[in-house]
Amino acid sequence: METFGVFHKEDDEQMDLPPGFRFHPTDEELITHYLHKKVLDLGFSAKAIGEVDLNKAEPWELPYKAKIGEKEWYFFCVRDRKYPTGLRTNRATQAGYWKATGKDKEIFRGKSLVGMKKTLVFYRGRAPKGQKTNWVMHEYRLDGKLSAHNLPKTAKNEWVICRVFHKTAGGKKIPISTLIRIGSYGTGSSLPPLTDSSPYNDKTKTEPVYVPCFSNQAETRGTILNCFSNPSLSSIQPDFLQMIPLYQPQSLNISESSNPVLTQEQSVLQAMMENNRRQNFKTLSISQETGVSNTDNSSVFEFGRKRFDHQEVPSPSSGPVDLEPFWNY
């Protein structure tokens, strides 16, 4: 059995329409088939176009007063003159006013001018400090061949057809179902709270390592061992660790007095930890101001001046390196 779409009018009268029916007339059709007939015959009514007083209705109330429409709604309206002897139209409502924008568009039937279309936007409040909304109205009036002076005296009235719709910021029209959902939403948001998408969360964040100046042999031994066993350096690749000379605590013999080599050692360790935090092991900068030119220890710090991929991995069978001359420099 064939089904029909049912639309309710204001007086609860039902209209049975075939499936897929949409009321989408052109500008010329609105003028010649609807507005012109309404002006000639006040008793004329259209199944898809209702009647409303725009001065007594707010734009968000109009979808519920329309006979038909999902994204745009049509009405017959009588323009209210602001002054009895003037030509200005009263477009104010209780909550705001309609303001004309742009230039009126001419509507032709063939080569003959039959009407004009005016675009208006609704503003909340009172002019000139009204707040612009997304409610838009197209107002159609007779003109040219069908203008008022070409009509009989009994038809000299101010009937117009208004098409009202609500648009988004992108210019698209919003259907009535969406407007209802928007109106039902509260001020609260159902979206989850923003979360930190950074891969460096609290679990993986490492504490900065403080390297004190070496003042004695015991302090030096503990600091060197702590630096290489610190969790912040645990992510260093094995190949990188193999390029670092292994120090034996028994072979370390550091004098109690200050030594410029210790300053150099501190710079190397700080550079290593900085590179580890940045996960960039391509280069390791060594300050030229504190660089040591002695031939005995220049090879020890050579790995800091070259790219790591050019270094030769020392053989593990070579045993520990005796740095006694180095520390007693």
Curated annotation (Swiss-Prot):
Transmembrane segments: none annotated. GO terms for molecular function: DNA-binding transcription factor activity; transcription cis-regulatory region binding. SUPFAM superfamilies: NAC domain. PROSITE patterns: NAC (PS51005). The lineage of its organism: Eukaryota, Viridiplantae, Streptophyta, Embryophyta, Tracheophyta. It holds the Pfam family NAM. One of its GO terms (cellular component) is nucleus. This is NAC domain-containing protein 79. Expressed at low levels in leaves. Keywords: DNA-binding, Nucleus, Transcription, Transcription regulation. Residues 114-173 bind DNA. PANTHER family: NAC DOMAIN-CONTAINING PROTEIN 79, PROTEIN CUP-SHAPED COTYLEDON 2-RELATED. Residues 17-167 form the NAC domain. It is found in: Nucleus.
